[in-house]
From Swiss-Prot:
Molecular-function GO terms, alphabetical: transmembrane transporter activity
Species: Yersinia enterocolitica serotype O:8 / biotype 1B (strain NCTC 13174 / 8081)
Keywords assigned: Cell inner membrane, Cell membrane, Membrane, Transmembrane, Transmembrane helix, Transport
InterPro entries: ABC_transp_permease
Gene: lsrD
Cited PANTHER family: ABC TRANSPORTER PERMEASE PROTEIN YPHD-RELATED-RELATED, AUTOINDUCER 2 IMPORT SYSTEM PERMEASE PROTEIN LSRD
Pfam families with a match to the protein in the record: BPD_transp_2 (PF02653)
Keyword Cell inner membrane attributed: yes
Protein name (Swiss-Prot/TrEMBL): Autoinducer 2 import system permease protein LsrD
Length: 331
Protein backbone atom coordinates (compact mmCIF):
# COMPACT_ATOMS: atom_id res chain seq x y z
CA UNK A 1 0.00 0.00 0.00
CA UNK A 2 2.87 2.39 0.86
CA UNK A 3 4.55 1.65 -2.47
CA UNK A 4 1.34 2.42 -4.34
CA UNK A 5 0.84 5.63 -2.39
CA UNK A 6 4.43 6.73 -2.98
CA UNK A 7 4.83 5.59 -6.58
CA UNK A 8 1.20 5.47 -7.70
CA UNK A 9 1.66 7.92 -10.57
CA UNK A 10 4.79 6.16 -11.82
CA UNK A 11 2.97 2.81 -11.73
CA UNK A 12 0.08 4.36 -13.66
CA UNK A 13 2.50 5.67 -16.30
CA UNK A 14 4.15 2.24 -16.56
CA UNK A 15 0.73 0.63 -17.05
CA UNK A 16 -0.15 3.22 -19.72
CA UNK A 17 3.16 2.52 -21.46
CA UNK A 18 2.49 -1.23 -21.60
CA UNK A 19 -1.09 -0.60 -22.78
CA UNK A 20 0.11 1.82 -25.45
CA UNK A 21 2.67 -0.63 -26.84
CA UNK A 22 0.09 -3.42 -26.79
CA UNK A 23 -2.52 -1.37 -28.66
CA UNK A 24 -0.05 -0.31 -31.34
CA UNK A 25 1.10 -3.92 -31.54
CA UNK A 26 -2.41 -4.95 -32.57
CA UNK A 27 -2.15 -2.65 -35.61
CA UNK A 28 1.49 -3.33 -36.42
CA UNK A 29 3.23 -6.41 -35.03
CA UNK A 30 6.63 -4.73 -35.46
CA UNK A 31 5.75 -2.62 -32.42
CA UNK A 32 5.98 -5.78 -30.31
CA UNK A 33 9.47 -6.61 -31.58
CA UNK A 34 11.92 -6.01 -28.72
CA UNK A 35 14.66 -4.91 -31.12
CA UNK A 36 12.36 -2.31 -32.70
CA UNK A 37 11.37 -1.06 -29.25
CA UNK A 38 14.99 -0.77 -28.12
CA UNK A 39 16.55 0.76 -31.21
CA UNK A 40 13.70 3.15 -31.98
CA UNK A 41 14.52 4.93 -28.72
CA UNK A 42 17.54 6.49 -30.44
CA UNK A 43 15.11 8.75 -32.32
CA UNK A 44 13.76 10.41 -29.17
CA UNK A 45 15.85 9.47 -26.14
CA UNK A 46 17.95 12.66 -26.29
CA UNK A 47 14.77 14.51 -25.33
CA UNK A 48 14.78 12.46 -22.15
CA UNK A 49 18.40 13.30 -21.35
CA UNK A 50 17.46 17.00 -21.31
CA UNK A 51 14.10 16.44 -19.59
CA UNK A 52 15.71 14.90 -16.49
CA UNK A 53 17.56 18.02 -15.23
CA UNK A 54 14.70 20.15 -16.56
CA UNK A 55 12.49 18.28 -14.07
CA UNK A 56 14.67 19.52 -11.22
CA UNK A 57 14.57 23.07 -12.58
CA UNK A 58 10.76 23.00 -12.72
CA UNK A 59 10.51 21.42 -9.25
CA UNK A 60 12.61 24.33 -7.94
CA UNK A 61 9.97 26.71 -9.26
CA UNK A 62 11.93 27.73 -12.37
CA UNK A 63 11.79 26.98 -16.07
CA UNK A 64 14.30 26.78 -18.90
CA UNK A 65 13.05 27.05 -22.47
CA UNK A 66 16.47 27.81 -23.94
CA UNK A 67 17.78 24.24 -23.98
CA UNK A 68 16.76 23.66 -27.61
CA UNK A 69 18.91 26.60 -28.69
CA UNK A 70 21.68 25.39 -26.38
CA UNK A 71 21.64 22.05 -28.20
CA UNK A 72 21.95 23.83 -31.55
CA UNK A 73 24.76 26.07 -30.27
CA UNK A 74 26.71 23.15 -28.77
CA UNK A 75 26.19 21.14 -31.95
CA UNK A 76 27.57 23.79 -34.26
CA UNK A 77 30.34 24.63 -31.76
CA UNK A 78 31.47 21.00 -31.89
CA UNK A 79 31.47 21.16 -35.69
CA UNK A 80 33.47 24.41 -35.75
CA UNK A 81 36.04 22.95 -33.33
CA UNK A 82 36.41 19.92 -35.58
CA UNK A 83 36.77 22.14 -38.64
CA UNK A 84 39.50 24.08 -36.84
CA UNK A 85 41.49 20.89 -36.37
CA UNK A 86 40.80 20.44 -32.66
CA UNK A 87 40.90 16.71 -31.72
CA UNK A 88 37.52 15.24 -30.78
CA UNK A 89 38.94 14.23 -27.39
CA UNK A 90 39.30 17.95 -26.64
CA UNK A 91 36.36 19.30 -28.67
CA UNK A 92 33.78 17.18 -26.82
CA UNK A 93 34.77 18.32 -23.28
CA UNK A 94 34.86 21.92 -24.55
CA UNK A 95 31.33 21.44 -25.91
CA UNK A 96 30.16 20.20 -22.51
CA UNK A 97 31.71 23.29 -20.92
CA UNK A 98 29.87 25.53 -23.40
CA UNK A 99 26.60 23.84 -22.44
CA UNK A 100 27.28 24.30 -18.72
CA UNK A 101 28.22 27.95 -19.37
CA UNK A 102 24.89 28.53 -21.13
CA UNK A 103 23.12 27.16 -18.06
CA UNK A 104 25.16 29.36 -15.73
CA UNK A 105 24.32 32.41 -17.85
CA UNK A 106 20.64 31.59 -17.35
CA UNK A 107 21.07 31.13 -13.60
CA UNK A 108 23.17 34.28 -13.24
CA UNK A 109 20.65 36.45 -15.07
CA UNK A 110 17.73 35.01 -13.09
CA UNK A 111 19.46 35.54 -9.74
CA UNK A 112 20.88 38.97 -10.58
CA UNK A 113 17.78 40.51 -12.13
CA UNK A 114 15.05 38.70 -10.20
CA UNK A 115 13.07 38.52 -13.45
CA UNK A 116 10.81 35.52 -14.08
CA UNK A 117 12.88 32.57 -15.41
CA UNK A 118 10.47 32.19 -18.35
CA UNK A 119 11.32 35.71 -19.54
CA UNK A 120 15.07 35.27 -19.01
CA UNK A 121 15.28 31.93 -20.79
CA UNK A 122 13.07 33.23 -23.59
CA UNK A 123 15.72 35.90 -24.15
CA UNK A 124 18.63 33.47 -23.94
CA UNK A 125 16.79 31.11 -26.28
CA UNK A 126 17.10 33.77 -28.98
CA UNK A 127 20.63 34.68 -27.82
CA UNK A 128 21.93 31.11 -28.04
CA UNK A 129 19.95 30.41 -31.21
CA UNK A 130 21.32 33.52 -32.87
CA UNK A 131 24.85 32.62 -31.78
CA UNK A 132 24.40 29.17 -33.30
CA UNK A 133 23.28 30.70 -36.61
CA UNK A 134 26.22 33.11 -36.50
CA UNK A 135 28.70 30.28 -35.97
CA UNK A 136 26.97 28.28 -38.69
CA UNK A 137 27.34 31.17 -41.12
CA UNK A 138 30.99 31.75 -40.23
CA UNK A 139 31.77 28.07 -40.77
CA UNK A 140 29.98 28.04 -44.13
CA UNK A 141 27.38 25.48 -43.01
CA UNK A 142 24.17 26.35 -44.83
CA UNK A 143 20.69 24.83 -44.92
CA UNK A 144 20.35 21.29 -43.65
CA UNK A 145 23.84 20.22 -44.68
CA UNK A 146 25.63 21.36 -41.55
CA UNK A 147 29.20 20.37 -40.83
CA UNK A 148 30.10 16.79 -41.68
CA UNK A 149 33.18 14.68 -42.24
CA UNK A 150 33.54 13.60 -38.63
CA UNK A 151 35.76 10.60 -37.80
CA UNK A 152 34.10 7.22 -38.29
CA UNK A 153 34.77 6.27 -34.68
CA UNK A 154 32.73 9.29 -33.55
CA UNK A 155 29.81 8.85 -35.98
CA UNK A 156 29.60 5.15 -35.10
CA UNK A 157 29.43 5.88 -31.36
CA UNK A 158 25.71 6.74 -31.13
CA UNK A 159 24.83 3.87 -33.47
CA UNK A 160 26.63 1.17 -31.50
CA UNK A 161 25.33 -1.11 -28.76
CA UNK A 162 26.52 -1.72 -25.23
CA UNK A 163 25.35 -4.87 -23.46
CA UNK A 164 22.85 -5.33 -26.29
CA UNK A 165 21.34 -1.86 -25.80
CA UNK A 166 21.77 1.23 -28.00
CA UNK A 167 24.43 3.56 -26.57
CA UNK A 168 22.04 6.58 -26.33
CA UNK A 169 19.61 4.45 -24.31
CA UNK A 170 22.41 3.32 -21.98
CA UNK A 171 23.46 6.94 -21.44
CA UNK A 172 19.83 7.85 -20.71
CA UNK A 173 19.55 5.04 -18.15
CA UNK A 174 22.76 6.19 -16.44
CA UNK A 175 21.39 9.75 -16.37
CA UNK A 176 18.11 8.53 -14.85
CA UNK A 177 20.04 6.80 -12.05
CA UNK A 178 22.31 9.79 -11.38
CA UNK A 179 19.54 12.38 -11.38
CA UNK A 180 17.29 10.14 -9.27
CA UNK A 181 20.05 9.83 -6.66
CA UNK A 182 20.73 13.58 -6.80
CA UNK A 183 17.07 14.57 -6.48
CA UNK A 184 15.80 11.98 -4.03
CA UNK A 185 18.84 10.92 -1.99
CA UNK A 186 20.91 14.07 -1.35
CA UNK A 187 20.61 17.31 0.64
CA UNK A 188 20.80 19.26 -2.62
CA UNK A 189 17.79 17.35 -3.92
CA UNK A 190 15.84 18.09 -0.74
CA UNK A 191 16.75 21.76 -1.13
CA UNK A 192 15.28 21.69 -4.65
CA UNK A 193 11.87 20.68 -3.26
CA UNK A 194 12.03 23.23 -0.45
CA UNK A 195 12.98 26.05 -2.82
CA UNK A 196 10.12 25.11 -5.13
CA UNK A 197 7.59 25.06 -2.29
CA UNK A 198 8.57 28.53 -1.02
CA UNK A 199 11.75 30.23 -2.19
CA UNK A 200 11.40 33.10 0.30
CA UNK A 201 11.20 30.75 3.27
CA UNK A 202 14.13 28.80 1.83
CA UNK A 203 16.24 31.98 1.77
CA UNK A 204 15.25 32.90 5.33
CA UNK A 205 16.15 29.34 6.36
CA UNK A 206 19.70 29.93 5.06
CA UNK A 207 19.40 27.33 2.33
CA UNK A 208 21.95 27.74 -0.50
CA UNK A 209 19.33 28.93 -3.00
CA UNK A 210 21.74 30.65 -5.42
CA UNK A 211 24.18 27.74 -5.44
CA UNK A 212 21.39 25.20 -5.94
CA UNK A 213 19.85 27.11 -8.85
CA UNK A 214 23.26 27.56 -10.50
CA UNK A 215 23.79 23.80 -10.22
CA UNK A 216 20.38 22.98 -11.73
CA UNK A 217 20.67 25.31 -14.72
CA UNK A 218 24.29 24.27 -15.33
CA UNK A 219 23.22 20.61 -15.33
CA UNK A 220 20.45 21.41 -17.81
CA UNK A 221 22.98 23.14 -20.05
CA UNK A 222 25.43 20.25 -19.77
CA UNK A 223 22.67 17.72 -20.51
CA UNK A 224 21.83 19.78 -23.60
CA UNK A 225 25.48 19.55 -24.65
CA UNK A 226 25.47 15.76 -24.12
CA UNK A 227 22.34 15.54 -26.27
CA UNK A 228 24.06 17.69 -28.91
CA UNK A 229 27.10 15.39 -29.02
CA UNK A 230 24.89 12.31 -29.34
CA UNK A 231 22.77 13.90 -32.08
CA UNK A 232 25.82 14.96 -34.09
CA UNK A 233 27.20 11.43 -33.75
CA UNK A 234 23.83 9.86 -34.65
CA UNK A 235 23.21 12.02 -37.74
CA UNK A 236 26.86 12.48 -38.70
CA UNK A 237 26.30 16.21 -39.10
CA UNK A 238 26.51 19.28 -36.83
CA UNK A 239 23.62 21.69 -37.46
CA UNK A 240 22.32 24.74 -35.66
CA UNK A 241 18.73 23.43 -35.74
CA UNK A 242 19.27 20.04 -34.11
CA UNK A 243 17.42 20.97 -30.92
CA UNK A 244 14.69 23.07 -32.52
CA UNK A 245 11.95 20.47 -32.01
CA UNK A 246 12.87 19.50 -28.43
CA UNK A 247 11.07 22.21 -26.45
CA UNK A 248 7.49 20.95 -26.29
CA UNK A 249 8.23 17.19 -26.06
CA UNK A 250 10.63 17.74 -23.15
CA UNK A 251 8.25 19.99 -21.21
CA UNK A 252 5.41 17.57 -21.99
CA UNK A 253 7.45 14.69 -20.55
CA UNK A 254 8.23 16.65 -17.37
CA UNK A 255 4.60 17.66 -16.76
CA UNK A 256 3.30 14.24 -17.77
CA UNK A 257 5.82 12.69 -15.38
CA UNK A 258 4.13 14.40 -12.45
CA UNK A 259 6.06 17.64 -11.95
CA UNK A 260 4.06 20.61 -10.71
CA UNK A 261 4.67 23.41 -13.21
CA UNK A 262 4.61 25.88 -10.27
CA UNK A 263 7.30 23.94 -8.41
CA UNK A 264 7.52 21.91 -5.22
CA UNK A 265 6.88 18.41 -6.53
CA UNK A 266 8.06 16.11 -9.28
CA UNK A 267 9.66 12.78 -10.05
CA UNK A 268 12.70 11.76 -12.07
CA UNK A 269 11.31 8.26 -12.57
CA UNK A 270 7.99 9.73 -13.68
CA UNK A 271 9.74 11.91 -16.25
CA UNK A 272 11.73 8.92 -17.55
CA UNK A 273 8.54 6.89 -18.03
CA UNK A 274 6.77 9.86 -19.62
CA UNK A 275 9.62 10.23 -22.13
CA UNK A 276 9.09 6.63 -23.22
CA UNK A 277 5.31 7.10 -23.26
CA UNK A 278 5.48 10.17 -25.50
CA UNK A 279 8.29 8.76 -27.64
CA UNK A 280 6.56 5.45 -28.32
CA UNK A 281 3.32 7.28 -29.02
CA UNK A 282 5.05 9.16 -31.84
CA UNK A 283 6.77 5.99 -33.08
CA UNK A 284 3.56 3.97 -32.99
CA UNK A 285 1.56 6.61 -34.84
CA UNK A 286 4.24 6.76 -37.53
CA UNK A 287 4.19 2.97 -37.90
CA UNK A 288 0.44 2.94 -38.57
CA UNK A 289 0.78 5.78 -41.07
CA UNK A 290 -0.70 8.68 -39.08
CA UNK A 291 0.16 12.15 -40.48
CA UNK A 292 2.46 14.31 -38.34
CA UNK A 293 -0.24 16.93 -37.75
CA UNK A 294 -2.62 14.36 -36.26
CA UNK A 295 0.26 12.82 -34.31
CA UNK A 296 1.04 16.15 -32.63
CA UNK A 297 -2.63 16.74 -31.85
CA UNK A 298 -2.93 13.30 -30.24
CA UNK A 299 0.19 13.95 -28.15
CA UNK A 300 -1.39 17.15 -26.88
CA UNK A 301 -4.67 15.37 -26.16
CA UNK A 302 -2.79 12.67 -24.23
CA UNK A 303 -1.09 15.32 -22.10
CA UNK A 304 -4.39 17.05 -21.30
CA UNK A 305 -6.19 13.80 -20.46
CA UNK A 306 -3.41 12.48 -18.24
CA UNK A 307 -2.93 15.79 -16.41
CA UNK A 308 -6.69 16.04 -15.80
CA UNK A 309 -6.66 12.46 -14.56
CA UNK A 310 -3.78 13.20 -12.20
CA UNK A 311 -5.52 16.32 -10.91
CA UNK A 312 -8.67 14.30 -10.20
CA UNK A 313 -6.67 11.61 -8.39
CA UNK A 314 -4.85 14.20 -6.24
CA UNK A 315 -8.08 15.99 -5.28
CA UNK A 316 -10.44 13.04 -5.24
CA UNK A 317 -11.35 13.62 -1.56
CA UNK A 318 -12.41 17.20 -2.34
CA UNK A 319 -14.44 16.01 -5.33
CA UNK A 320 -16.07 13.34 -3.14
CA UNK A 321 -16.96 15.93 -0.49
CA UNK A 322 -18.42 18.25 -3.14
CA UNK A 323 -20.54 15.43 -4.57
CA UNK A 324 -21.74 14.56 -1.08
CA UNK A 325 -22.79 18.16 -0.44
CA UNK A 326 -24.59 18.28 -3.80
CA UNK A 327 -26.40 15.06 -2.98
CA UNK A 328 -27.46 16.33 0.44
CA UNK A 329 -28.66 19.60 -1.10
CA UNK A 330 -30.80 17.75 -3.64
CA UNK A 331 -32.30 15.53 -0.96
Amino acid sequence: MNIYRRYGWELALAALLVLEIGLFGLSNSRMLDINVLLFSTSDFICIGIVALPLTMVIVSGGIDISFGSTIGLCSIFLGVMFQAGVPMSIAIPLTLLVGALCGLINAGLILYTGVNPLVITLGTMYLFGGSALLLSGISGATGYEGIGGFPTAFTDFANQTLLGLPVPLVIFMVCVLLFWLLMHRTHSGRNVFLIGQNSRVARYSALPVARTLCLLYALTGMASAIAAVLLVSYFGSARSDLGASFLMPAITAVVLGGANIYGGSGSILGTALAVLLVGYLQQGLQMIGTPNQISSALSGALLILVVVGRSISLHRHLIYEWLQRRRNTVV
